[in-house]
A protein has these predicted regions:
Chain A
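A short helix->beta-strand "capping" segment at the edge of beta-propeller domains
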Residues: 1-20, 54-56, 110-113, 290-296
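Solenoidal tandem-repeat scaffolds enriched in leucines and small polar residues
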Residues: 110, 115-227
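WD40/WD-repeat beta-propeller blade N-cap
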Residues: 16-23, 61-68, 111, 116-125, ...
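Conserved strand-to-loop turn within each blade of WD40 beta-propeller repeats
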Residues: 38-41, 84-88, 142-145, 195-198, ...
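Loop/turn segments within WD40 beta-propeller blades
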Residues: 26-32, 72-79, 129-136, 178-189, ...
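WD40-repeat beta-propellers
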Residues: 44-49, 71, 91-96, 128, ...
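C-terminal interaction modules of eukaryotic adaptor/scaffold proteins
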Residues: 294-297, 301-372
Length: 378, 651, 346
C-alpha cells in the first residue's frame, strides 16, 4: 500500500513585476481577477487575469511623487476604482475609463484617470481603505502624524468630489488601518481599527491620552461611529498589543457576535473583540467598556518582526509574513484553536539548487522541504 | 485546505501535526516579504520593504510569486466522483431530515452503498485511464488509485461496523466478506486449480499457500475441494483434516442455539482437533498440521504465515473465525491487536486507520482519514453519514459534544474548496447551504465574488442565490452588472440590471446617465425599455422622471401634442427634474408653444413662466429671451381663446 | 416498457445536447456543448455497449472540438452541419463527417466577434436556423441574419433591443421573434431596413427574461416562450392584440422546450430547477369559437388540465438542454452529467 499523504500540495507561478524599485503592496480586486501593485518607483500597475491562469499587464502609470505605500480597490458597484496613498502626503482616487478608442487600447492597455487628489495630510499617508459598501462610497486614510481622515463621495457618479467628513487626531504615528467588514449595521456600528508603529519611548506612551479613555499603552485603537452624535470616537485601545504595529486586518464576520482582528507586530496575533451588551456595559461616569478583548492566538514562529497579515476570503486562513522572509498560513480548527498549516520559505535545499527563475506564467509544483520531522509518517 | 487535522490531543499521540514547509522556487526573496490573498486558495508573495528611505535595489527582488493549492479533485476523472457523490450527499441530507421523525437506518445503508459504488466506478475509471497513461500522468493516476482503494476499504469496514444492520451484531460473515473483497489473495489460483480439476495439483507452486489462504479467508469448502485434488487426497491424513473442516460448528444467529450452547459444541470440536493433532498422525504432513493449528486458532501458526501476506488484514477474518466466531462488531479490538502484533513491521497509514476503526475509536479514524490527500472528500462524506446515523460522538476536553461542529467544519471546508472551481461552484454551494448558518454566510461572500463574464452566468448565480434565499447576493450581482454597463456607457443594460436588482440607488444612477446622454447626444436611450417598464419605474424619482420624459417623447412623436404638453407641464411643476436637465425641459416647451393650435392653457403658460424665472441660471440669456417671447405669445392667444369660452374642457 | 433513465458523468457542465439524425438506422451519435468551465468544448458521442452481450449502452466520446467561451446554442443548418453560438461573441458552422463520426469536426465558417461591445467581448447568447439561414442574437442587442451556405452576414438589425437578447426563433423565412432579458418580445421583418419591430409585447409582468422560444410544428402562428421564472407563455400571432396565456410551470427558469418531432401534441420542457416534463398539448391547439364569435384558444390557466408528467425525479442541479428523437430523450445538466431516457411513449 503506497503513501496516502501527498507531498506536492502547492504550485507556484512567477510574475516579473518590472517595478523599478521595491514593491510595497499588492491588492486583488473584489473578484480576484485583477491585481494592482504599487512601488517606491512611484508607479502603480494593474494586471488582469487572462482566464488561463496567467496575468497580463493592462496599465502602468506614475501615480505619485513619492513611494506609493498602499493600493486598494473599491467595490465594483462603484465601477473600476482604486485608491493609492503615498509618501508625497497625498492619496489619490483613480478610475478606469471604459473602452475607448484610446491609443493603447489595441495593445490591451487601459486608461486610468486621476479623479481626485486628497491633499489634506501634512505628512506621509501610510494607509488607505475604502469603507464597506453598505455605508456608501467612503474612504479612510491615515498618516504618519496620526490623523485619520474619513472622506465620502456624496455622488458616486462623480468621483472628483470627495468631502472630508471626519478628521480624527490620534497623536501617535499611524501605520495601518482596517474596516470592520460586518454587514450588520444594526448590530455593529461602523468600526475602524488602526495600528500605530510609534516606537516605545516613555514620551510616546505618556502622550497617548486624551479622548475619554484612560491612558493606554496599547498600539491598536478601535474607533466606532455613533449615529446619534454623528461622530467617530475611540471606544477601545487594545492594551494587549504593546509593540509597534505594522499591519492589522479584520476577518470577515460570517454572522458571528464577535470580531476577529489579526495584528502584525513583533508576533502574529489574533484578537477576539466581543461587543458587550449596552445594559451591562454602561458605567456611571460615562467611561463605558464596549468590548471584551481576548488574545486568542499569539505566534512567535517568525522569530522576527511581522510585516503583513492577510485573511483569505472566508476568514478561515490567515497568511502572515515577516522579516524571516517566510510566509506562514494559520488555520482555525473546528474547536476554534489556531495552528500553522504551511510555511513558505526561501531557504535553498542543501545540495540541490532550485531552478533559476523563468518569466513564465504556468504554475509549477513545489516540493516540500526534505525534513523528515515535517512528514507525519513513512 | 485539507493539509491539517484537528488539534485535539489525540489519545495515541502518534502523529505530529507539524506544518509542512515549502521551499519557494527561484530564491527570489532575499529580504522582507509581503503577502496578499486572491480568490480561494490563491495568494501572492511579494518582496517588500517598510523603509521610507529609498535604497538602491537589485531588480531581482522584483518578482511576484503566485501560490495556489494543487487540488486533486479538480482532475476530470475525479470531477465525476465529486458530482455524483454530491447527489448522494443531498439525498442523505433529505433522509436525515426524515430520520428525525422515523427510523431511517435502511435508507442510510442504501446511501452508504451508493457512496461505495461511486468509489468503485471512480476506481474503474482511474484504472482504465492509468492503463492508457504514461510517465508522470500514470504515476499520478496510480497514486489516486492507491488513495481510493484505501478509501473504499475503510468505507466498507465502517459500513459493516456502524451503518449496516447486522443480525445479532455477529460480525464474522461480514468481516470475512470484507477481507475477501479487498484482499483477494490466492483467489485466482484457487479458481484455476479447481477449474483444471486435476489430481496432483500440489505440483503447482502455490498449492499449499492457496489452500492455507482459503482456510484463512474462511472459505472452508474451497479449501476442502482443493485438498481433494492432492494426489494423496484419499489418504487418511487428508480425510482426517477434511473431516475436521467439515465438522466445524458455524455460528448463526438464526441457528436456534444460544451463544453458550454454541460455545460448548465449539469447544468440543476444538478438543477433538487438538487430540487429533497431539496423536501425531499428521506428523508426515506438516502442511496439514499447519491447517489444523490454524483452525484451532493457534497464535504461532498464524504468526508463521503472516509473512506471506502484505498486511495483517488478510488474516484478520481467519483469526476471528477460529478464535471467537461469536464476536460482536464492537469486540474486534483484541483481534486487531493480535493480528497486527504478529509481525513487527513499519505501520502504514491504512494500518492505523483500520486499527482505530476496529477498536471503535472513530475520533482517531476521522483524524487519520483527514491526512489522506483527497482534499477532504472522504472525511467529509464519511463523517456526515456517521453523524446522521447517530454513530459519532466526539467530546472535547470539557466533555461537551462537538460532533456537529466537527461535521460542519469538514463540510464547510469541502464546500468552500469546490466553490473555487470555475464549474464546480454550484456543487460547493449545495454543501455550504446544508450547513447553516455559517455555510450561508460563507456562500454569500464567495458567491458575490464569482467572476461574471456573461449575463447567463449572472442569471445562474442569481437563481442559485435565490434558491438559498441569499437575496443580498442577487441584488449585489445586479448592481455590479449595472455598474459595468454604466461605465461602458450602455444605458439600456444599466437600467435593466438596476431594475432587476430593485436598487433605488443604482436605478437613479442609471437614469441620470441616460438623461445626461440625452443632453449631450439628443438621443434618448433605451426607449423600448422605458415605455414597457412597469412598477419598477417607482424605484427612484430620477427613473420615474426619465420614464415620464420618455413618454413625453412618445406622445410628441405620435403628434399627440395636447397630451405631450400636459405631461411636460407636470414634469416641470413636479420639480423632480435634475438640475442639469432644466434647460432641456424648458426648451422642450418651445416647439409646443409654437404649434398651430395652442396646446398649453394659460395656467400652464404661467407655470412655465414661473419656472423660467426661478431657474433663469439654467438657460443662457438668448435662449431665455426666445422662450419668454414664445410664452408671452402663447399666453396672448390662449387668454384670448379662453376668454371666448371656446376652449373646450381644459383638463 | 417502463421509462429507463441512465446518467453518465462527463466532467463538464452541458449547455446543449443534440442527436445527430441518421437516415435509415436508429440515431446513435449526439453532440454536446459545455459551459462554465476553464476550457469548454463541443463533443461528439456515440452510444455503445461495452460488452457485446449487454443491453445497456453507454456514451463514448468520439471527438472533441475546443472552443473559447461557453457554448450557448447548437442548431443544425443541414443534416451534418451545426451552427454554434459562443459566449465570446463568435458563431461557427461545424461539420461532422457523415461516414466517420470519430473524425474531428471540420470548421465550415467562423464569424469572429460577430457580437461585440466594440473592443470588448460580448456574448452571442443564442441562434436559430431555418433552411440554411442562421439568425443570431447577443447581449449587444443586435440581430444578425447569416447565410449558412455562403457564409456571409446577410442582414444586421443594430440595436434591435436596448437590453441583451436571450432567445430567438424563426417564424418564417422573413420573420424572427426575439425575447430579451426583461421578457420583452419583438417580431422583426428581416427584409425591413428601418430597425423597427413589426410587433412587440411582454412575456409577463415580472420583467424576467424570455429564456427560450419555439413555434408549434404544424401551426407556426402558435408561439411558445419559456420564462426565467419557470412560466410558459403561448401566443397566437393571428390575433391583432396579443392575448397571452401564461402557465406557472416549473419552479425555476425554463431552459429548453421541444415539441416531439413525430407527435406535435407532445411538448417536452426542462428547467433550472432540474425538472424534465412532458406536456400533452392536444387541447391547446383545438381552437373553439368564443361567445363573441371570435376564435378563442384554450387558456392554459391550469396546468393539471394540460396533463403534465414528470419524466425523471428532479435533479439537484439545472437541466440545461434536452433533445428528443422518437422514444429517446437526451438531457444535459449542470451536475456535469448527461441523461438518456429510453422507452418514452409519444
Amino acid at each position: 500500500m503506497g503513501e496516502l499523504t501527498a507531498t506536492n500540495l502547492f504550485e507556484s507561478q512567477t510574475i516579473l513585476a518590472d517595478h523599478k524599485d521595491l514593491i510595497h503592496d499588492v491588492a486583488y480586486d473584489f473578484y480576484g481577477e485583477r491585481m494592482a501593485t504599487c512601488s517606491s518607483d512611484q508607479y502603480v500597475k494593474v494586471w488582469d487575469s487572462d482566464g488561463n491562469g496567467g496575468w497580463r499587464l493592462t496599465a502602468s502609470w506614475k501615480a505619485h511623487h513619492g513611494s506609493v505605500w498602499k493600493v486598494t480597490w473599491a467595490h465594483p458597484e462603484f465601477g473600476q476604482v482604486i485608491a493609492t496613498c503615498s509618501f508625497d502626503r497625498t492619496a489619490a482616487i483613480w478610475e478606469e475609463v471604459g473602452d475607448t478608442a484610446a491609443s493603447g487600447s489595441e495593445k490591451g492597455l487601459r486608461t486610468w484617470l486621476k479623479r481626485s487628489n486628497l491633499v489634506d495630510s501634512r505628512t506621509s499617508v501610510t494607509d488607505v481603505k475604502f469603507g464597506p459598501k453598505h455605508l456608501g462610497l467612503l474612504l479612510v486614510t491615515c498618516s504618519a502624524d496620526g490623523i485619520i481622515r474619513i472622506y465620502e463621495a456624496p455622488d458616486v457618479m462623480n468621483l472628483a468630489q470627495w468631502t472630508l467628513q471626519h478628521e480624527i487626531p490620534t497623536k501617535v504615528s499611524i501605520s495601518c488601518l482596517s474596516w470592520n467588514p460586518s454587514l450588520s449595521r444594526v448590530v455593529h456600528p461602523p468600526m475602524l481599527a488602526v495600528g500605530s508603529d510609534e516606537p516605545n519611548t516613555t514620551n510616546a506612551a505618556a502622550s497617548v491620552q486624551g479622548d475619554k479613555t484612560t491612558a493606554c499603552n496599547g498600539k491598536v485603537f478601535i474607533y466606532e461611529y455613533s449615529e446619534s452624535s454623528r461622530r467617530w470616537t475611540r471606544t477601545d485601545c487594545l492594551s494587549s498589543v504593546q509593540e509597534p504595529v505594522n499591519d492589522i486586518a479584520f476577518a470577515p464576520n460570517l454572522g458571528r457576535s464577535f470580531h476577529l482582528l489579526a495584528v502584525a507586530t513583533k508576533d502574529v496575533r489574533i484578537i477576539k473583540i466581543e461587543p458587550i451588551a449596552e445594559s451591562a456595559a454602561s458605567g456611571n461616569n460615562g467611561a463605558t467598556v464596549r468590548f471584551k478583548c481576548e488574545v486568542v492566538a499569539a505566534f512567535e514562529e517568525h522569530y522576527s518582526c511581522v510585516w503583513r497579515v492577510c485573511w483569505n476570503l472566508t476568514g478561515t486562513l490567515l497568511a502572515s509574513s515577516g522579516d524571516d522572509c517566510a510566509v506562514r498560513l494559520w488555520k482555525m480548527q473546528y474547536l476554534n484553536q489556531w495552528k500553522c498549516v504551511a510555511v513558505f520559505k526561501n531557504e535553498p535545499v542543501p545540495g540541490d539548487s532550485p531552478p533559476q527563475s523563468r518569466p513564465h506564467t504556468t504554475y509549477i509544483r513545489m516540493a516540500t522541504m526534505a525534513n523528515p520531522t515535517h512528514m507525519p509518517f513513512h | 485546505m485539507n493539509t491539517s487535522s484537528f488539534a485535539v490531543d489525540s489519545s495515541r499521540g502518534k502523529t505530529v501535526d507539524a506544518a509542512k514547509t515549502f521551499v519557494l522556487p527561484d530564491k527570489c526573496f532575499q529580504k522582507h516579504v509581503g503577502c496578499a490573498w486572491g480568490r480561494g486558495n490563491k495568494f501572492t508573495i511579494y518582496p517588500r520593504s517598510q523603509t521610507v528611505n529609498k535604497t538602491p535595489t537589485d531588480t531581482a527582488d522584483n518578482k511576484l510569486l503566485n501560490i495556489k493549492q494543487d487540488i486533486l479533485l479538480f482532475t476530470p476523472i475525479l470531477r465525476k466522483l465529486v458530482n455524483e457523490s454530491n447527489g448522494t450527499y443531498l439525498s442523505l441530507q433529505k433522509a436525515a431530515e426524515a430520520a428525525k421523525v422515523s427510523d431511517n437506518q435502511v435508507e442510510f445503508l442504501k446511501l452508504s452503498r451508493q457512496f461505495r459504488s461511486i468509489i468503485r466506478v471512480c476506481l474503474e475509471n482511474l484504472q482504465e485511464a492509468a492503463a492508457k497513461a504514461e510517465g508522470i500522468e500514470k504515476n499520478n493516476l496510480l497514486s489516486y488509485i492507491t488513495i481510493f482503494y484505501s478509501i473504499e476499504c475503510i468505507w466498507h469496514l465502517c459500513e459493516i461496523l456502524y451503518i449496516d444492520n447486522i443480525p445479532g451484531d455477529i460480525v464474522l460473515p461480514y468481516l470475512l466478506e470484507w477481507v475477501r473483497f479487498h484482499f483477494p489473495c490466492h483467489e485466482q489460483t484457487a479458481a484455476q486449480l479447481l477449474g483444471a480439476c486435476e489430481r496432483g495439483s500440489e505440483d503447482h507452486e502455490d498449492y499449499w499457500d492457496t489452500v492455507v489462504g482459503m482456510v484463512v479467508q474462511g472459505r472452508v469448502d474451497v479449501a476442502r475441494a482443493l485438498l481433494k485434488l492432492h494426489s494423496a487426497g484419499e489418504s487418511n491424513e487428508f480425510k482426517l483434516v477434511d473431516n475436521s473442516l467439515r465438522s466445524m460448528p458455524v455460528y448463526s444467529v438464526y441457528g436456534g442455539i444460544s451463544t453458550g450452547e454454541f460455545t460448548i459444541s465449539w469447544k468440543h470440536w476444538q478438543a477433538e482437533c487438538r487430540s487429533k493433532l497431539s496423536s501425531r498422525v499428521l506428523a508426515s504432513q506438516p502442511k496439514l498440521e499447519l491447517i489444523m493449528k490454524i483452525i484451532m486458532g493457534d497464535y504461532s501458526a498464524f504468526e508463521s504465515i503472516r509473512s506471506k501476506y502484505s498486511s495483517w488484514f488478510d488474516i484478520l477474518g481467519g483469526w476471528v473465525m477460529f478464535t471467537a466466531p461469536w464476536s460482536r462488531r464492537h469486540e474486534l479490538g483484541a483481534a486487531a491487536a493480535a493480528c497486527a502484533g504478529m509481525q513487527a513491521t513499519g505501520r502504514s497509514h491504512l494500518d492505523d486507520m483500520v486499527r482505530a476503526l476496529l477498536e471503535g475509536d472513530l475520533h482517531q479514524v476521522i483524524h487519520e482519514i483527514q491526512q489522506i490527500s483527497d482534499n477532504g472528500w472522504f472525511a467529509t462524506h464519511l463523517t456526515d453519514i456517521l453523524f446522521h446515523c447517530g454513530k459519532l460522538t466526539i467530546m472535547d476536553k470539557h466533555q461537551t459534544n462537538v460532533t456537529s461542529r466537527l461535521r460542519d467544519s469538514l463540510i464547510l471546508e469541502y464546500g468552500c474548496l469546490l466553490m473555487e472551481h470555475k464549474s464546480l461552484w454550484s456543487v460547493g454551494l449545495s454543501y455550504l447551504a446544508s450547513c447553516p448558518p455559517e455555510g450561508l454566510r460563507r456562500a454569500e461572500l464567495i458567491l458575490e465574488r464569482m467572476p461574471v463574464d456573461t449575463e447567463a452566468k449572472a442569471m445562474k448565480i442569481i437563481a442559485e442565490a435565490k434558491k438559498y434565499e441569499l437575496i443580498g447576493v442577487a441584488q449585489s450581482v445586479c448592481r455590479c452588472m449595472c455598474a459595468r454597463h454604466l461605465s461602458a456607457g450602455r444605458a439600456g443594460g444599466a437600467l435593466c440590471w438596476a431594475m432587476r436588482g430593485r436598487s433605488s440607488a443604482a436605478s437613479s444612477r442609471a437614469a441620470h446617465a441616460a438623461l445626461a446622454h440625452y443632453t449631450q447626444h439628443a438621443v434618448l436611450p433605451a426607449q423600448d425599455l422605458l415605455l414597457t417598464a412597469g412598477s419598477a419605474m417607482l424605484l427612484s424619482d430620477t427613473l420615474l422622471f426619465l420614464g415620464k420624459y420618455c413618454d413625453f417623447h412618445r406622445l410628441y412623436k405620435t403628434r399627440e401634442f395636447k397630451k405631450a404638453a400636459q405631461l411636460l407641464v407636470s414634469l416641470i411643476t413636479s420639480k423632480i427634474a435634475p438640475e442639469y436637465f432644466w434647460e432641456t425641459l424648458l426648451l422642450d416647451t418651445l416647439p409646443l408653444l409654437e404649434s398651430d393650435e395652442p396646446v398649453f392653457t394659460s395656467n400652464d403658460t404661467y407655470e412655465i413662466m414661473l419656472c423660467l424665472e426661478l431657474r433663469s441660471s439654467s438657460l443662457d440669456g438668448e435662449k431665455a429671451d426666445l422662450l419668454r417671447l414664445a410664452l408671452a405669445r402663447n399666453l396672448a392667444r390662449t387668454a384670448l381663446a379662453e376668454g371666448d369660452g371656446t376652449e373646450e374642457g381644459a383638463q | 416498457m417502463p421509462l429507463e433513465v441512465q446518467g453518465t458523468f462527463v466532467s463538464q457542465k452541458i449547455s446543449k445536447i443534440r442527436w445527430i439524425a441518421e437516415d435509415y438506422v436508429e440515431t446513435k451519435c449526439f453532440f454536446t456543448g459545455s459551459w462554465d468551465d476553464d476550457q469548454n468544448s463541443i463533443k461528439v458521442w456515440t452510444l455503445e455497449s461495452p460488452h457485446e452481450e449487454e443491453e445497456v449502452e453507454y456514451p463514448r466520446q468520439l471527438s472533441e472540438y475546443l472552443v473559447d467561451g461557453d457554448v450557448t446554442q447548437i442548431k443544425f443548418t443541414e443534416k451534418n452541419k451545426i451552427a454554434v453560438s459562443l459566449s465570446n461573441g463568435d458563431v461557427r458552422v461545424l461539420e461532422v463527417s457523415l461516414y466517420d463520426k470519430q473524425f474531428p469536426l471540420k470548421e465550415v465558417f467562423h464569424w469572429k466577434k460577430l457580437h461585440n461591445y466594440g473592443a470588448e467581448q460580448c456574448s452571442c447568447t443564442s441562434l436559430d436556423t431555418l433552411e440554411g439561414d442562421i439568425a443570431t442574437i447577443g447581449e449587444d442587442g443586435n440581430v444578425n441574419i447569416l447565410s449558412g451556405r455562403r457564409g456571409e452576414v446577410m442582414h444586421t438589425i443594430k440595436g434591435a433591443d436596448s437590453c441583451s437578447l436571450h432567445s430567438i426563433c424563426f417564424i418564417k423565412h422573413t420573420e424572427v421573434i426575439t425575447g430579451n432579458v426583461r421578457g420583452h418580445m419583438k417580431i422583426w421583418d428581416v427584409r425591413s431596413t428601418n430597425n423597427k419591430p413589426s410587433a412587440a409585447f411582454l412575456l409577463a409582468g415580472d420583467e424576467l427574461a424570455a429564456t427560450c422560444i419555439i413555434h408549434h410544428p404544424t401551426q407556426p402562428h402558435i408561439i411558445l416562450a419559456g420564462s426565467e421564472s419557470g412560466a410558459l407563455a403561448v401566443w397566437d400571432l393571428r390575433m391583432n392584440s396579443f392575448p397571452t396565456s401564461l402557465v406557472n410551470a416549473h419552479s425555476a427558469g425554463v431552459s429548453e422546450m421541444q415539441f416531439h418531432p413525430e407527435n406535435p401534441h407532445k411538448l417536452l420542457t426542462c428547467s433550472v430547477s432540474g425538472e424534465l416534463w412532458e406536456w400533452n398539448m392536444e387541447a391547446m391547439t383545438k381552437s373553439s369559437k368564443g361567445p363573441d364569435g371570435q376564435v378563442m384558444w384554450m387558456p392554459l390557466q391550469d396546468k393539471k388540465s394540460m396533463m403534465v408528467n414528470s419524466l425523471i425525479p428532479a435533479l439537484h442541479k439545472s437541466i440545461n438542454s434536452l433533445h428528443c428523437d422518437k422514444g429517446r430523450i437526451l438531457c444535459g445538466a449542470d451536475n456535469e452529467a448527461i441523461y438518456l431516457i429510453k422507452n418514452f411513449k409519444y
